[in-house]
C-alpha cells in the first residue's frame, strides 16, 4: 500500500492520501485527544503526543503537528499508523460514535432568518460547489454556520484551521466570490 503525502498551505499540517475512501460522507475534525476517542485511527494519531489536530476528508487524512515539531521526525510515525489502520481494514469509528460530522448551524448561536432562505441557499450552493472542493485540495474543509444582516459565518476545519493564509483566503477568495454572486453578502467571518 502506498500512502501519498502532500503539503498544505498550513506548514504545520500534512495531507495523507491512502488511495482509498476515508469518509463515506461528510468530514470529521478532531481538535483534541478527547474528541478523537470516537475514532481508533484519530486516537492512535493523537497518542503520538506531537499531534494537535486530525481531520478526515473524503479521500484523505490531514494531520497537524504541535508547534516546534518537525515533520521529518513525525511523518514516519504517522505513516506507520495510517498503514496499519488501512491494511487492517478496521472501522474508522467506534460502533457507538457517529462518523459524519457537520455541526448543526445553531451550535454557534446563528439562527437563520426564514426570510433569507433564497440568499442562504445561494450561499450554501456556492460553498458546496466552488469553495469546499478547493479547500479539500488543501487538506481542509469549510462549513456554513450562518447568515445575519449581510454577514456570512463559516467554520474552517482541518489544515485550514490555524493556517497562516486562512484569513487571506477567507477575505480575498471566499468573501469576494460570495459578494460577486450574492449581492446581499457584505462580509465573511470565521467562527
What is each stretch, according to the model?
Residues 1-191:
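Domain-level signature for proteins that mediate thiol-based redox and metal-cofactor handling
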Amino acid at each position: 500500500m502506498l500512502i501519498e503525502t502532500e503539503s498544505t498551505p498550513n506548514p504545520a499540517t500534512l495531507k495523507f492520501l491512502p488511495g482509498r475512501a476515508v469518509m463515506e460522507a461528510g468530514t470529521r475534525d478532531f481538535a483534541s485527544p478527547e474528541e478523537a476517542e470516537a475514532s481508533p485511527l484519530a486516537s492512535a494519531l493523537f497518542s503520538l503526543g506531537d499531534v494537535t489536530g486530525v481531520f478526515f476528508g473524503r479521500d484523505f487524512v490531514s494531520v497537524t503537528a504541535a508547534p516546534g515539531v518537525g515533520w521529518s521526525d513525525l511523518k514516519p510515525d504517522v505513516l506507520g499508523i495510517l498503514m496499519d489502520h488501512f491494511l487492517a481494514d478496521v472501522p474508522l469509528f467506534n460502533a457507538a460514535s457517529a462518523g459524519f460530522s457537520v455541526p448543526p448551524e445553531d451550535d454557534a448561536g446563528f439562527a437563520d432568518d426564514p426570510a433569507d432562505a433564497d440568499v442562504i441557499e445561494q450561499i450554501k450552493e456556492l460553498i458546496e460547489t466552488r469553495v469546499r472542493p478547493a479547500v479539500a485540495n488543501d487538506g481542509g474543509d469549510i462549513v456554513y454556520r450562518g447568515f445575519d444582516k449581510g454577514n456570512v459565518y463559516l467554520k474552517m476545519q482541518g489544515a485550514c484551521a490555524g493556517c497562516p493564509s486562512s484569513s487571506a483566503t477567507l477575505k480575498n477568495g471566499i468573501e469576494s466570490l460570495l459578494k460577486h454572486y450574492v449581492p446581499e453578502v457584505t462580509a465573511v467571518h470565521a467562527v
